[in-house]
Amino acid sequence: MDLLYTTVRKGNANTFSFTETQHNFEFLCNTSSCNVLAFTTTNELTEPSPIQGWGFHIYVVDLNAPWFPYRVTSNKYPISVLQWDVLGRYLLVGDRNGHVQIFVQKDNLLSEWKSVYSVKFPGENIIAAAFFHNGRKLNLQTDKKDQYLYLEKFQKVKFAASVRQFGGVPVEGVLIVSATGMLGAFVIPPESNANIQKLSEPIKLVPVTESLAVTRNYYTTADICYGKNGYFRVAVGNGDSKSANSNMIQCFRVAVKQREETLEINSTALPSFFLAEGMGKDLKELRVAHVQWVFSEDADSLIVASNHTGGGCFVEQWELTEESTPIHKLFQSNKNEPFKTLLWVSKSQYMYTSKVIKICTTKLNFLSSSFVYLAMSDNSIHCLQRDTLKRLTCTNIVSIRDPNDHSSKQIKLGLKIGAIDVTHLGHLFVTLDTFGQLYVYRCNFMCQDQLGTPALIVQTVNLLEYCLVTGLDSLDILLTLKTQILENVLERLTENFHRQPPNVQQYYYVNFLTMKIALYRLSISGQQKAHDLSNLLILHSILIAFKSLLRPSDLTSHDKGPAENLAMVLSESVPDVDKVLLNVEAKEFTMERPTLQSLQQLIQWVADLALNILAKLPESRSFMSNKSQGYDISKDIIALNSIRELLVMIRIWGLLNPQCLPVFSRSADNLDILGTLFRLLTKLSLNPNEPDDLLLDECCLLPNQVLIPQLQYVPSRTMIASPLLPHVTLPVMCDYGVENESLKFCPEVPIVEGGLSNDNVIDSVMYLQLGRRPPSLRRCTRCGSCSSVVSVAKTAAMKAWEQRWIDKCRCNGFWRLEVA
């Protein structure tokens, strides 16, 4: 385990003398599938002293920008449960007074949160919660990991949804367990995100309750996992020293059904066991501290962490097995088959001299590197192998600062580990201390060192493809990727994608481009390739948006639409755009004038892209070898033909409404820039790898005929997944509220001869100029792109375009509010 970075609060040496560990408050942290960490603190992170701003606060932070924490809420009672849904959209918060709230991002900003649903279980201490399973599960087949087809490599697992309504549609909802042995469940209304954003106050939902056991009992720890048949499995324990059942673990099977407009909960007892029956029977006064299912889906194994009076801990793995039990022949219904029963069997154990504070496990069960993590009272972190509980590594959060640092940055002895968690893909391990400070470790190098380079490339590509297919965020893979295999990973990822069937390629095309952009941005030399791929992604989105506006003039023609007819005409490579217009049906491209006017900024971007490709062509062919690796948009025939299709549409629309045409600063008024661009792109598309000298000469003259606008470049970005990360000393020391300057990367902007530069901030969604210093904007936490907070879309076409990026940036990053 390598410490990647730490994020600490600003302060001086005197303010850290207050110790929070004397209070019996539980600290929690949970990582979503989008690699956003939610965590609790008892002080505001913006205050220099832990004593100031005392309360029960919840913060979220993007693991790629850990210096910007955003407060979700401040609670009146201690927080006892913190849980994300599978998509990372809902954040569930439960407290010791029985109040459960569900938060979502306000206005789709990571920096703003609002409570949308509220449920009350008066007086109940919520100790566990789980969202209903949606029945969708995809596994990587380890025996087919060398296959290139996604449909063979990734198999859908037969898994039933937790609650289903009419037609088998999964229901969204939550199951909770309280300390008094109460089960509670409620349904989340199927509201759209737009309707949720309009709520001024949270909707109060009505829950259904039931007893977990026949009689209500007191429990101190609980965990919930999903069964493949749609039920839940609940494991509970009571670590109270005054209880007679302090070393007993009880398990239940819970089924939640929807009956008309209400829910019905049924709880059935499963075999239970005592810790004295296991390998720790010789230890005195074992008290259950934590129970944890090995996996959250269809688990038969349970990790039980206990503390004993000697000051140490005992961790044991129990497995539910089916064993034959001998019975008298008079009681056998079938004499040919033995009578079988379910029993818990102790499989492995681990002992340590300090008490265990927290426990967590890796979340995916098909990974070869599946671990159990333990946080101890002596601030040590232990990583155990899942099956044998053999210790693989051990580290400590104390003394990680440089001894030459200022005293305000030194770790104080009063710090204790508060909570731990691991990301969904298991590559990053997060530790939260009692002052709300973060310690993020890279933990996949333990298995990387054991693999050869070819096997490591295959494993990395498989995980990236799993993210591509499932939609999981791949940030933790990017942060642990070795730079020396980056090119090989990109090559294999691209090769595998192009070997997929056409329908599969079309379905995952945007996800594939987004992933390649993120990979190229990890290296300093890959910035231009990432920029070209970003332009390709925008070009593809504009082409799809424009094609969706076309309507066939003859409704009886179902074979081909206007877009297909246009592509067929362009396949003949006619260089004159006006001759192309003679072969297309103009009525199929007819639209309202206001709609055409609203598309002007997107039309302008297409024209600017065409100008930049052609203006850079002579320089790129003279300084770069044709065998150079990586992506180059000027060599992409599909991209060039997409621009040609758009130029034909723009030409037709310009005849309907000249105000929608792109604006050029040309040397002579009689120059037909659109016609020239189409002609040159047609020539280039015939042989993009080796354009003839005549074409290069014409491209050299292009900056003399028209000013070339500079395409949008993010001037600088500061993030953990920076190209500078391999060149800085680890761990990276970060402070809350201050960007780390050592990771600030300013990409080299290629200057086009005769180009027109612009210092204004450009909206990355609407492609409007926002000025040099706009008062407020939303900025992406991953790529640094900016967009206006205020919607300017007036027509249905532009509103649909804006909705494409309303939730996230085109790089799949989160928007955050930035105020000047």
UniProtKB/Swiss-Prot annotation:
Repeat positions for WD: 74-114, 621-665, 757-811
Coiled coil start-end: none
Keyword RNA-binding: no
Subcellular localization: Nucleus
UniProt entry keywords in alphabetical sequence: Activator, Nucleus, Repeat, Transcription, Transcription regulation, WD repeat
GO cellular component: mediator complex
Primary site of residence: nucleus
Keyword hit for Hydrolase: no
Pfam families named in the record: Med16_bridge, Med16_C, Med16_N
Membership in a protein family: Belongs to the Mediator complex subunit 16 family.
Name of the protein in its database record: Mediator of RNA polymerase II transcription subunit 16
Organism of this sequence: Aedes aegypti
Name of encoding gene: MED16
